[in-house]
């Protein structure tokens, strides 16, 4: 009987029915995503800075060449160098603008993930109120089914999920009784019937 069970054993079995692994995994995935986004952003920034430094050095080199061209008073080379410098300047400005836009986008994603993480932390491992209530209702049904099973009674649901059949096993006699549950009979009636069948 249920009352003969050790309370610690019942509590242990009940705790085993709680499923907090998905929430813990979700928090872990969010933390991993935040770390990955941060690393990606830092890598992009380093690549952009490296590219800008290379372009700056190249620009300096071109400037030196330009100065030498001016000193040589070669108008055609000077004009070509200026055009090339303007082109590279435009490319650098465009690259910087794209990097700034990408940085703002990544920052926006990071803020959304931080808000999501804060919501999950506020809800705790048990989830929000609606989730907790649904889990408690499911746990209560599972606990009742376990108690019935421990007594030798299997309650079977129909296609709609309603419990309409009970299989009662009398281990002392080796008998098996199948009872169709009809809503017109009270729970008290079925409790007495189940008990008498198990004891009979």
From Swiss-Prot:
Q: Which Gene3D superfamilies match?
A: 3.30.160.430
Single Gene Ontology BP annotation: sister chromatid biorientation
| Coiled-coil regions listed in the entry | 42-129
Q: Where in the cell is it found?
A: Nucleus; Chromosome, Centromere, Kinetochore; Cytoplasm, Cytoskeleton, Microtubule organizing center, Spindle pole body
Q: Can you list the GO cellular component terms from the UniProt entry?
A: cytoplasm; Ndc80 complex; nucleus; spindle pole body
* Superkingdom to which the source organism belongs: Eukaryota
Q: Which Pfam families match?
A: Spc24
Q: Cross-referenced InterPro entries, in alphabetical order?
A: Ndc80_Spc24, Spc24_Fungi_globular_sf
Q: Which UniProt keywords apply?
A: Cell cycle, Cell division, Centromere, Chromosome, Coiled coil, Cytoplasm, Cytoskeleton, Kinetochore, Mitosis, Nucleus
How does this protein assemble? Component of the NDC80 complex, which consists of ndc80, nuf2, spc24 and spc25.
Record's function text: Acts as a component of the essential kinetochore-associated NDC80 complex, which is required for chromosome segregation and spindle checkpoint activity.
Q: Which family does it belong to?
A: Belongs to the SPC24 family.
Q: What is the name attached to this protein's record?
A: Probable kinetochore protein spc24
List the source organism. Emericella nidulans (strain FGSC A4 / ATCC 38163 / CBS 112.46 / NRRL 194 / M139) (Aspergillus nidulans)
Q: Which gene encodes it?
A: spc24
């Amino acid at each position: 009987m249920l009352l003969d069970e050790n309370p610690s054993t019942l509590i242990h079995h009940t705790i085993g029915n709680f499923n907090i692994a998905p929430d813990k995994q979700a928090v872990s995935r969010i933390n991993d995503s935040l770390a990955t986004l941060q690393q990606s952003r830092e890598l992009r920034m380093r690549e952009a800075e490296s590219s800008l430094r290379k372009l700056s050095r190249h620009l300096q080199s071109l400037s030196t060449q330009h100065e030498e061209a001016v000193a040589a008073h070669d108008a055609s080379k000077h004009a070509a160098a200026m055009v090339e410098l303007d082109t590279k300047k435009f490319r650098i400005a465009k690259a910087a603008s794209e990097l700034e836009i990408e940085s703002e986008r990544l920052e926006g994603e990071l803020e959304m993930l931080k808000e999501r993480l804060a919501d999950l932390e506020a809800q705790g491992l048990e989830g929000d109120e609606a989730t907790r209530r649904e889990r408690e209702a499911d746990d209560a049904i599972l606990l009742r089914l376990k108690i019935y099973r421990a007594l030798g009674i299997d309650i079977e649901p129909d296609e709609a999920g309603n419990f309409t059949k009970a299989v009662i096993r009398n281990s002392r006699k080796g008998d098996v009784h199948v009872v169709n549950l009809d809503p017109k009979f009270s729970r008290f009636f079925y409790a007495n019937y189940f008990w008498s069948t198990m004891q009979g």
